[in-house]
Amino acid sequence: TGALLLDGNTLNYFGKIFLPDGLLDRYQAFELIHARKPEDFEKYQAFELIHAR
């Protein structure tokens, strides 16, 4: 879960500059920042290749 990512380094990197109060609740934001590929990554990758040409 996002709560597991709230260590000191993560809070220093994704601090108030990047996640200001009121924009997202910190726990909601860390659910989005999980460093996993999306389920449909291949589709997005194909679109990026087409866009890059």
From Swiss-Prot:
Free-text remark on how the cofactor is bound: Binds at least 14 chlorophylls (8 Chl-a and 6 Chl-b) and carotenoids such as lutein and neoxanthin.
BP GO annotations: photosynthesis
Domain of life: Eukaryota
Residues at which chlorophyll a 2 binds: 51
Positions contributing to chlorophyll a 1 binding: 48
Record PTM text: Photoregulated by reversible phosphorylation of its threonine residues.
Binding site for chlorophyll b 2: 53
Localization per Swiss-Prot or TrEMBL: Plastid, Chloroplast thylakoid membrane
Primary subcellular site in the record, as a coarse category: plastid
GO molecular function annotation: chlorophyll binding; metal ion binding
Coiled-coil residues: none
UniProt KW keywords: Chlorophyll, Chloroplast, Chromophore, Magnesium, Membrane, Metal-binding, Phosphoprotein, Photosynthesis, Photosystem I, Photosystem II, Plastid, Thylakoid, Transmembrane
Binding site for chlorophyll b 1: 18
Bilayer topology term: Multi-pass membrane protein
A GO CC term attached to the entry: chloroplast thylakoid membrane
Function as written in the Swiss-Prot or TrEMBL entry: The light-harvesting complex (LHC) functions as a light receptor, it captures and delivers excitation energy to photosystems with which it is closely associated.
Domain notes from UniProt: The N-terminus of the protein extends into the stroma where it is involved with adhesion of granal membranes and post-translational modifications; both are believed to mediate the distribution of excitation energy between photosystems I and II.
Assembly and binders: The LHC complex consists of chlorophyll a-b binding proteins.
UniProt family annotation: Belongs to the light-harvesting chlorophyll a/b-binding (LHC) protein family.
Protein name: Chlorophyll a-b binding protein 1, chloroplastic
Native organism: Populus euphratica
Organism classification: Eukaryota, Viridiplantae, Streptophyta, Embryophyta, Tracheophyta
